[in-house]
From Swiss-Prot:
Name of the protein: Phosphoenolpyruvate carboxykinase [GTP]
The gene coding this protein: pckG
Cell compartment(s), UniProt: Cytoplasm
Organism field: Mycobacterium ulcerans (strain Agy99)
Ligand binding (substrate): R81, Y220, G221, G222, S271, N387, S388, R389
Quaternary structure and interacting proteins, as annotated: Monomer.
InterPro entries: PEP_carboxykin_GTP_CS, PEP_carboxykinase_C, PEP_carboxykinase_GTP, PEP_carboxykinase_GTP_C, PEP_carboxykinase_GTP_N, PEP_carboxykinase_N
């Protein structure tokens, strides 16, 4: 079929010649049955969702409990980001660095072009214009995803500002990121489709210099919703390096004191370490309130006043379901319960609701994420996949900050880094200065989780929680953070802190209750910013004593809190070789500022008790 005979190509709702020629080129290569330009309307969402129900991809949920919501069950081989198949194809291998997979870009283009040839046969090719961040921004970051997955189109409406408004923003010649996606499952005449098409061959490829994303073979969230990690972190981090800003794997939280003063805090944690829970914090301290601006990604630019301002480029939440419940994150539950949600790989109850491990209730019978019968206390496997997800509109969140759609963003007072560590790392530490804060972030260690392939439980270094998401060399990335500090007024920069909610005692109990009680740590952070709270100087930074924290009304043993705050110099001396191994791995591009910080830490620990 030539492009001239592919229905839909000749009725494009745009005169953008660059877009039109790209769409035609892709259609000629992939050979879809038809081309549809997505408009982002509610009607389109309903129509495609109904189509997915008919295809067996979606199950419509109980409308009384989850209005306009659906459950999708993926192929068991397509359940998470595939870091081993994710590539940064920079022109030079050194620019991808040691943390990324690299292939020569011309070789990768040849290889993937062969995969794309005819790959949409029997399917509809959707052209999905979208904007990351508010449409009213001075420099809106636009993109177009071409995909053969209705699941992607529906999810992109939730996760991005998608459709006609984004297309109009592009005008006739505006720049956009080209994001090409196919599930890699062409259909021959008469061939029946499967509920979750995908391919055993998977590539998620980024070309940072040309700002392109090519994805093949996976229908799963992070591999297929190309506005998310692919654009908002991997491509955007390369843009940010070139343009002097930061694209980071961070939540954005607004804390409001009893005096009604607002503080905006950005926090970077690896996946499944409590980002969404902190983003939707429900403070337990009287008089304190919290609102959310985002749970996953922050773009930070300097304002005219010299402060760092953050926006959330996303439009929805794509949260890990297991462990989310009315105690751990009531605001996430309220957001989901408002409806318009796409669940993936959770379990289905007999009355058309969803369930996952950690959710209240003990259903006796379920259909699990693989579509099999599941019985309480009889079936040995989990009912929901550990990386199962909910995809839900941000606008439904009951504690959404009114500034969430402000193109100017919000001024950041503190940046938090955090990971999941049973030992060594105290509950909260304040960095000595910006460069020390960058060192803390660059050497962040966390026990591995189910959000990516790999062995659960291993501690891996995850700089700024960006290990899987840096679009260029890790050494250059860390140097960019240092340069952000050097090129600004340090008095206006956010204060940097490190938190660890997950420290355990010798009996393996969590020493800190976490969840809403984390507001007590946040209060100390705010009071440090205001120079109102005490703290103890330690070799790793300033750590509060038990007396420095507001523990009034806390149902916890002060001895446990003291242990959670402890800085054990011997444990840290044992940590030094692990940090050094990571710094050696970064290699020749390791910033001298980071080496200086490491040497200074060794010196401070040498004489510490």
């Amino acid at each position: 079929m030539t492009s001239a005979t592919i229905p839909g190509l000749d009725t494009a709702p745009t005169n953008h010649q660059g877009l039109l020629s790209w769409v035609q080129e892709v259609a000629e290569l992939t050979q879809p049955d038809r081309v549809v330009f997505a408009d982002g309307s509610d009607e389109e969402f309903h129509r495609l969702s109904a189509q997915l129900v008919d295809a067996g991809t979606f199950t419509r949920l109980n409308d009384e409990k989850f209005p306009n919501s659906y459950l999708a069950l993926s192929d068991p081989s397509d359940v998470a980001r595939v870091e081993s198949r994710t590539f940064i194809c920079s022109e030079r291998e050194i620019d991808a660095g040691p943390t990324n997979n690299w292939m020569n870009p011309s070789e990768m283009r040849t290889l993937m072009t062969d995969l794309y040839r005819g790959c949409m046969r029997g399917r509809t090719m959707y052209v999905v214009p979208f904007c990351m961040g508010p449409l009213g921004a001075e420099d809106p970051k636009l993109g177009v995803e071409i995909t053969d997955s209705e699941y992607v189109v529906v999810s992109m409406k939730v996760m991005t500002r998608m459709g006609t408004a984004a297309l109009e923003k592009m005008g006739q010649d505006g720049f956009f990121v080209k994001a090409l996606h196919s599930v890699g499952a062409p259909l021959e005449d008469g061939q029946a489709d499967v509920p979750w098409p995908c391919s055993d061959t998977k590539y998620i490829t980024h070309f940072p210099e040309t700002r392109e994303i090519w994805s093949y073979g996976s229908g799963y969230g992070g591999n297929a919703l190309l506005g998310k990690k692919c654009y908002s972190l991997r491509i955007a981090s390369a843009m940010a390096r070139d343009e002097g800003w930061l694209a980071e794997h961070m939540l954005i939280l607004k804390l409001i004191s009893p005096e009604n003063k607002a503080y905006y805090i950005a926090a970077a944690f690896p996946s499944a370490c409590g980002k969404t829970n902190l983003a939707m914090l429900q403070p337990t301290i009287p008089g304190w309130r919290a609102e959310t601006l985002g749970d996953d990604i922050a773009w930070m630019r300097f304002g005219k006043d010299g402060r760092l301002y953050a926006v959330n480029p996303e439009f929805g939440f794509f949260g890990v379901a297991p462990g989310t419940n009315w105690k751990s994150n009531p605001n996430a539950m309220r957001t989901i319960a408002a409806g318009n949600t796409v669940f993936t790989n959770v379990a289905l109850t007999d009355d058309g609701e969803v369930w996952w491990e950690g959710l209240e209730g003990d259903p006796q019978h379920l259909v699990d994420w693989k579509g099999n019968e599941w019985y309480f206390r009889e079936t040995e496997t989990t009912a929901a996949h550990p990386n199962s997800r909910y995809c839900t509109p941000m606008s439904q969140c009951p504690i959404l900050a009114p500034e969430w759609d402000d193109p100017q963003g919000v001024p950041i007072s503190a940046i938090l880094f955090g990971g999941r560590r049973k030992t060594t790392v105290p509950l909260v530490t304040q960095a000595r200065d910006w460069q020390h804060g960058v060192f803390i972030g660059a050497t962040l260690g966390s026990e591995q989780t189910a959000a990516a392939e790999g062995k659960v439980g291993n501690v891996r270094r995850d700089p700024m929680a960006m290990l899987p998401f840096m679009g260029y060399n890790v050494g250059d990335y860390v140097q960019h953070w240092i340069d952000i500090g050097k090129n600004s007024d340090e008095s206006k920069l956010p204060q940097v802190f490190f938190v660890n909610w997950f420290r355990r005692g010798e009996d393996h109990r969590f020493l800190w209750p976490g969840f809403g009680e984390n507001s007590r740590v946040m209060k100390w952070i705010v009071d440090r910013i205001e120079h109102k709270a005490g703290g103890k100087t330690t070799p790793i930074g300033t750590v509060p004593t038990v007396e420095d924290l507001d523990l009034e009304g806390l149902d916890a043993n002060p001895a446990d809190v003291s242990e959670a705050l402890a800085v054990n110099a011997q444990e840290w001396r044992e940590e030094l070789p692990l940090i050094e191994e990571w710094l050696q791995f970064i290699g020749e591009k390791l910033p001298t500022g980071i080496k200086d910080e490491f040497d200074a830490l060794k010196e401070r620990l040498r004489d510490a008790e």
